[in-house]
Amino acid sequence: VAEFIRAMGVDPGLAQTGYAVVEVSDKKGIARVWDTISTDPKDSMSKRLHKIFTDFEKIFKKWNVDILILEGIYVLPKYPNAALQLGAVKGVVSLAAAIENVEVRELKPTEVKMALTGNGRARKDQVERAVRKIFMFKDRIRSDHASDALALALVGLSRYGMIKW
């Protein structure tokens, strides 16, 4: 039986949180699932956070994730409230991970962009193209959030010596 590790990349957001599970065996990565969790902007903050938490509880259980790679918070100074929202989302995702004994690590967006494209200020489409090339996807990844989550999982696994591309 081949040994493998499963990593989940998460691009946190209150409206949409991207996630992706990448399985690694023999230093090769296979994307198992990538998607977004959406919340209703009409709902209260606590209800939205609860939805994100319960969805991640289910995802961690279903995919038996070993390591979570969360995107670090990057917020423009003119949107300070966004930092608070992202921090809350990261908190509930981290809590769901802790309950399932999933190790949590964090990467800055600039680190991920630099590792995949050679440019720490790469655009979303450049990151998506790099991710598609590594996984040999023919079709464009529909969601930027899911694409970013795949990128986080890849770079996190690479950073810790578990994968090569």
Role assignments for model-derived ranges:
Residues 1-165:
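Phosphate- and other anionic-substrate recognition elements at nucleic-acid/protein interfaces
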